[in-house]
Structures are given as structure tokens and as C-alpha cells.
Amino acid sequence: MKHIALLTTLLLSASLQAVEKPYDYVFFENSLMKGDYFYSQAKYTSPSWIKNARHHLPVAGSVAFTPGNSLELTYVSAPGGDWYSEIQYCPVRGNDFFREPSTLSMQVRLRESMNAAALPNIAIRYADSTYTQYLNLRNYLKDTRPGVWHPVSIPLEDFGLNAVNDTNIKKLAAVALRPGTADGNEYTIYLDDIELLPASLPSVSALNAPVLQEAKAYERHIDIKWIPQSKEDIKYYRIYRSFDGITYQPVAVRRPWMNRYTDFLGEVGKKAYYKVTAVDYALNESNDSQTVSATTYPMTDEQLLDMVQEANFRYYWEGAEPNSGLARENIPGRNDMIATGASGFGIMAIVAGIERGFITREEGVQRFLKITSFLEKADKFHGAVSHFIDGTTGKTVAFFGPKDNGGDLVETSFLFQGLLTARQYFNQENDKEKQIRKSIDNLWKNVEWSWYKQFKDSPYLYWHWSPDQAWVINHKLIGWNETMITYMLAIMGPKYGISPEMYYSGWASQEEYAQEYRADWGRVEDGKMYTNGNTYYGENLKVGVSNGGPLFFIHYSYLGLDPHKFTDKYTNYFENNQKMAKINQRYCIENQGGYVGYGEDCWGLTASDFAWNYQAQEPMPHRDNGTMAPTGALASFPYTPDASMKALRNYYRNHGSFLWGEYGFRDAFNLTVNWVSPLFMGLNQAPVTVMIENYRTNLLWNLFMSHPDVQKGIQKIQSIK
């Protein structure tokens, strides 16, 4: 027997010491994808058998305790054979604070009457592939009537587990199932709501019925929204839908941090009616809300662009950390932590949202007063901000570990690309907008870009500086990648700027160290000099490592910096970026890896969430595993408008049932392995809104490029012969 206490991590990062409202450790609630469930495993040895698809458990779409689906476990346990199945914990980036559990809880439903002894045995698998002891499920399922959901609660101490808490809970990797009595018969059971719960859960004497605010229809989906209630009392909201206004069926749940539901109907001209209830941890349900309804309708390309821009904008407006008004790293994820680079992108998305009428200018002004006030008080490191900040305190969060506890110059540059854009937008002569400009000017002039050279004669800028460990990370900034804007803003800095020559000595360096750096991460010699000159898929690429890299390289630095208007010794960057986008699409059309879905309307390899971690995909076989992020093609609209529009239509009309959500398209998907990310990412939602707006009106480009310091900096670089 193995005890979880033995797995306690001794050294905790500073981020785990923060105070944040805890949440539940959930192995399964619902699958976004039909077919097989990615975070599961199923295998057998004949004559036993377990139903599976590609060694995963099937998703049961028509049977569910928590709508809309459950997992199907159909098996034969025969003498001389064996089977095994597990339901894995799906890691959510930033979910690190959990209610201390005491039980493994689930809902179980038998399809038919069965021999209770043939129920599976159950254990918990550790991350190191060892197991707790197996228990007989029949000892905890007291009621075996078929066709009814039965709650099952197994004390963790029965598995030999004790002292489970935030320091070790992620060592619990999966719920494992093996045969009980081998009687040779076929049985089916359904499993739902598999989670670890504490002994004492929040409850209330009476739940208030939610108050619905709107139902808004689009081409193939309807959004409903309600007034949020106290999150402490509610486990989830349950959404009911009717097509006749009389008979309602539960179709989904939403955890209390989300007060919206996107119902993807997949049809045009479909009317639906909705009600919502609140459900507490004892599964008590409130009265119904009032009814709202809407009807889907055909949309033009321009209307689809509006729809996508607004949904992605919503991430930064409704999904923002409330005290700072800035962007979270991802949703779901760490509630109190803001990501500074994503916030800079979101600032530009909010400006676009004002111009598009998603919010009023006055609403935008109030948000920016909050943002600038927060940033003025937040931790700074020679004027630079950290990558992650606690939105409730303004203190640095060392989310990537104890070395990441100081200034992050790249994230600072992403933030200030947005702030300078906003500074130019809020140009009215009233007290509030004057205050916004004054605050941004003060923040801007106090960034000590030159400090991040590390030493006086350094040809490079450095990514990080720690107040107690100095240059411990010691990462030089060398292009080609996402950091062009860092060098550009450092040259533009009004008080602590760097020499414009550092554009060539640092960013575009041709020193041996820089050559080795590029060849190492690109795993090719192409582009190691910064310049390239090779032709890929019919496009001659003047600058770039390998055949261009992930597409965020042509997005992040150019949300405000207009690549049409920047030409250095080697290339014009609109033309060069456009070639990279075309190379990426043509690689996906050719599809050497044979990945499901790739083509002229499914392309755009870039950095995104993946099943177990964050990865950067690019158009090279060794950097491509079939994972596609919608932001890749959609943030490339200025470069490839026709190809990007094809991708938008495809993602929405053909894959919207799992890919489209409350904040636009989910971060990534992989049709080859039937996986979709549960996340919306702060770094990936805004570039879609911003670059579509730049394609349509040049708005953000015009604003950023109008700043006097930006104009001076570009002139300095372009004057170098």
C-alpha cells in the first residue's frame, strides 16, 4: 500500500503560497468531443473484452447525469482474460488550488440488471504509474437498480490515501478500473461526475433562481447570459433548452465562474427557448429562471467577422480579473493571476471593441482608469513588470518557478505595445482621458530598457532580471521570433532607451553565438544568420529561421507595429510575414503527416495548449503533431485574408460544436486524436480580434504608429546604413 503523504513535494514555488479560492479536482464532468474520450484508456486481453475506440473509452451522448454526456464502460470479464480502463485527470494550466478532498465521488448507472460481483474493482493511479490498492465497487454501490443514476462516495482513506492537499494532489493521475468477478457476461455501466470532494461542502438553505439577461442568436449558435450569483454556494448552473417552448431538456452545465452559455445548434433558422437553474453541492436545485429565446439566421462574412471579434474581445472584458481589469493567463485557470503580455494584447482588443460598439467609450474609459491605476501600484523591476501579477495585490507571481520572480522584458514590451496604442486612442480633452494618458506616459518613461542589457557594452537585451538572483536565467534576446517588439520599444524608450544599433547587434545579430542559438532551436541551418534566402513551397523567405516558425512570430510584435511601414536592411516585414503565412498554409495543404482535417481551410501552426502542456507547432514534420490553433490562421487575416476567411468558416460551421465557446474559438484542437483544449488562452484570443481589425480598418496599427516615440524609433533604425 502506498500513501500519498510520501509524495508530498518539499519545495514549493512561491506561486503555490498565494491565496485563491479553491476548486474541485475533477477527473470527468463532460466531454467536448463526441466519439472517444481522449483522457481515458481502455485495453484488454482475450477472452475478456472492453469496448473502446483507439484504446479510449466511448463517450455516451444520450446518457448523462450532468448534461450533456457520460462515459460508457461496456465489458466482458472472462476467466483467463483481463481488461483495464482509466479516466485521467485533464491538467488545466494554473489550476493549483483545490478543496482538500476526503472522498472519490461519482455517479454510476447500470444499463441492465447485473451480478453485483461483476462490477469493476477501482483504484487511483499515481503519476509514477503505481497504484493504490484496488477496492470492490460493489461495496460502495448499495443500490444496483438499472436505468437510474446512483451516487457513489469512496473515502480516500479506504484507498490508503491521507493528507491529500495542493502540494501532492496532482500526483493522483487517474481513476483505474479492472475486472471484478469473471463470469463471462457482457455488462454496460455509465460513469459521470468523477471527482475528489471534501467531507464538508458549501451549501445554502435556498438557492435563488438565476436572472437571464439576454439570448442572442448568430448563424449556428445562441448565446445566453445571466446575472452571476455568489460562487461559494453554487456547484454549477444547469441549462435547459426547448424547441417548442413547452418541453425542456437539460443540455449543459456551467461552473459558477462562467455566467454565459453558448449553445451550438449547428443549424440556420432554428429557434430555441432557454431556462437556467442553480445547483448546490448537495445537488439541490433552484427554481427556474425566466424564459428567453432566439432564432439563428444566415450571416455574411462581415457579420461572421463581427461575431468572432466580439466573442474574443469578451475574454478581456467579461473574463478579466476584476480588481485590475487585466487579462488572466487562461480561462479556466488561475483566477487571481493576470498575465502582462496577454493583458497588453487585450488592451488593444478593448480599443477595437469600443470602435466596434461592443462597449461604450465611457465603459472603456472606466476600465482603463482601473488598469492604469493598478499598473502604477504593481511591482516593477527597473520599470519592467513581471510575467505574472496577483491581480488582488499587484505583487509578482513566480508562476514558472522561483527564478521567474522579477522583470520580464518581453512581456513588458507586449504590455506597452498595448498601452501606447491606448494612449493614442484616448485623445479627448477631458479629465478622465487626460489621466489615462498621463498614467501611461509615466509608466512608459520609467521603463529602464537599458538596464536589461546586463552590462554596458552588451550587444543584446536580456529577457529576465530577478531582484534576488540577478541574471540567473541569462537568456539573450535574439531574433527571429516574437521579440522584435522588445528591441523596437527599447530603442523608442524616451528616457532609458538603447542604441538603435542594437537592432542589428542584438535582434538581428550575426555573431557566432546568435547563429548557434538559431540553429539550436530551429534544428536546421536555414536562417541561422537571421537572413534566410531559401525558397519554401514557392515562397522566397528573406528573413526567418527554418521555414518561418510558428505563426505567433508574425502576430505578437505586429499587433501595433505596422509591418507595411517597417523595412530594415533585409526586408519589408509585411512582405516577409505574408510569405511565412503562405508557407504555413501550403505546408498544411500538403500535409506530409497525414493529419486529419489539415487543408486549405484548416491551417496555421503556432503556439497553443496541447493535451498535456503548452507547445509551439510549426510547419516542419518534427515540430508538428496534428494540433491546430484557430488563432494561427485568424490572426493572419492582414496577410492572407482569403485563406483566413476559409479557415474561419470551416472552424465555425464544421467544427463549432466542440470548438466554439463563450470566448470564441477554444485554444486548439487535434482531430487525429479527437482532442480539443478546454481553455481559452489570453495570448491567443486577442490577436484574432486585433488583427482582424487591422485587416478591416488598420485601427490598431494607425494608433500605435502615430505615437511620436514610435515614429522616432523607426526613423532611427531605418537611418542605419
UniProtKB/Swiss-Prot annotation:
Temperature curve summary: Optimum temperature is 40 degrees Celsius.
Record's GO cellular component terms: periplasmic space
pH dependence: Optimum pH is 6.0.
Catalytic activity: [(1->2)-beta-D-glucosyl](n) + H2O = [(1->2)-beta-D-glucosyl](n-2) + sophorose
EC code(s) of this entry: 3.2.1.214
Origin superkingdom: Bacteria
Residues annotated as domain Glycoamylase-like: 474-708
Enzyme class, broadest EC rank: hydrolase
One Pfam family this sequence matches: Glycoamylase
Recorded GO MF terms: hydrolase activity, acting on glycosyl bonds
Keywords: Glycosidase, Hydrolase, Periplasm, Signal
Complexes and interactors: Monomer.
Biological role: Catalyzes the hydrolysis of linear beta-1,2-glucan and beta-1,2-glucooligosaccharides with degrees of polymerization (DPs) greater than or equal to 4, to produce sophorose. The best substrates are tetra- and pentasaccharides. Acts as an exo-type enzyme that releases sophorose from the non-reducing end of the substrate. It cannot hydrolyze cyclic beta-1,2-glucans.
Name of the protein described by the UniProt record: Exo beta-1,2-glucooligosaccharide sophorohydrolase (non-reducing end)
Organism classification: Bacteria, Pseudomonadati, Bacteroidota, Bacteroidia, Bacteroidales
